[in-house]
Regions:
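Charged catalytic cores and adjacent phosphate/nucleic-acid-binding surfaces used
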Residues: 1-31, 43-84, 92-95, 147, ...
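Phosphodiester-processing cores and adjacent nucleic acid-binding clamps
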Residues: 68, 105, 109, 116-117, ...
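Flexible, glycine/proline-enriched loop segments at strand-loop-helix junctions
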Residues: 89-98, 123-126, 162-163
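Conserved phosphoryl-transfer catalytic core
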Residues: 97-124
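Conserved acidic, metal-coordinating active-site core of Asp-based
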Residues: 126-191
């Protein structure tokens, strides 16, 4: 049976494989398709698609948006985006500008804590990448300030560390709307990782469904069988498609491999077939997927 992976990161955000290397690794692993879902950027998609040309692998254009809901970081994956559309690229510029401001302030704080770093040096060390905290951690490790990536997060850039600066984020509802307007399939990523009560998670999913959520990540690298069953029940309750992904980052997540996660992950191609069927319905009848109070009028603001 063919397998797929619908949640994968490259060097264009915080992964350690280039988009081209991901294609080769996916072929080695026997995948029929994978989605490149870098954080807040589509910069690696063209390279991945070009690398896959003429090879037995499909590269699905995707993204993973960071958003905030009731004080928690919530991620929304988008698949089959019209990522080159003017609308979508304008939205990404806003995300990039927000990250630049955050990163400049983090560099200033690191300098105050004895780290010789400038934003320009950081960007030059990771050309073409959306700078995330993983890049800071790698910089600190390679320049001898820490002995491990974990130490970098604990001492400098983790959530409770002195040099961390939170970014202003959109709501997950807004992320769903942006993905829909870009012609994509919005999916709630790894809901178990948010450590919400069942009632609170149900409330979040209901709110997202109201604005057009299509899928939910019910198959994921770290889920226990009981957790997968919980999310599958939630998907059934709200008539959502099942999605699945490893959240592969390469060396940034040691022991977690593409498609197989920590060894137990299995995402059958049927998952992608169902999502493709839903996507075809969306394109054929777009009005049916804009009936639930989706407010596109102010999305350029």
């Amino acid at each position: 049976m063919n397998i797929v992976d619908l949640h994968v990161h490259s060097t264009k955000s915080d992964g350690s494989y280039t988009p081209s290397e991901l294609v080769e690794h996916a072929i080695e692993k026997g995948l029929s398709a994978f989605a490149l879902t870098d954080h807040d950027t589509t910069a690696g998609i063209d390279e991945a698609i070009a690398a896959a040309a003429g090879k037995p692998i499909e590269v699905i254009p995707g993204i993973e948006f960071s958003s905030e809901y009731e004080g928690r970081d919530i991620h929304i994956v988008g698949l089959y985006l019209d990522y080159k559309s003017d609308f979508f690229q304008r939205r990404l510029v806003n995300f990039v500008n927000g990250r630049i401001m955050r990163n400049q302030e983090m560099c200033r704080r690191l300098q105050e804590h004895g780290v010789a770093i400038t934003y320009e040096e950081l960007v030059s060390e990771f050309p073409g990448s959306v700078i995330t905290r993983a890049h800071y951690a790698r910089y600190l490790l390679s320049h001898g300030y820490v002995k491990s990536l974990k130490e970098a997060f604990d001492r400098y850039v983790g959530d409770n560390a002195p040099c961390f600066v939170p970014r202003k984020k959109i709501t997950p509802m807004r992320a769903v709307e942006i993905i829909l307007k870009a012609g994509g399939i919005p999916i709630l990523a790894h809901p178990i990782l948010y450590h919400m009560s069942s009632a609170r998670l149900d409330k979040l999913v209901a709110s997202l469904k109201e604005v057009g959520l299509i899928g939910i990540e019910a198959i994921y690298s770290t889920y226990a069988p009981s957790e997968e069953r919980e999310i599958r029940r939630l998907a059934e309750r709200y008539d959502l498609c099942i999605s699945g992904g490893s959240d592969f980052h390469g060396s940034a997540k040691p022991g977690l491999d593409l498609a197989t996660g920590y060894g137990r992950l299995f995402i059958p191609e049927e998952v992608l077939v169902n999502l493709k069927r839903k996507h075809a319905e969306m394109k054929a009848h777009p009005e049916a997927f804009r009936r639930n109070k989706i407010l596109f009028t102010d999305l350029d603001g």
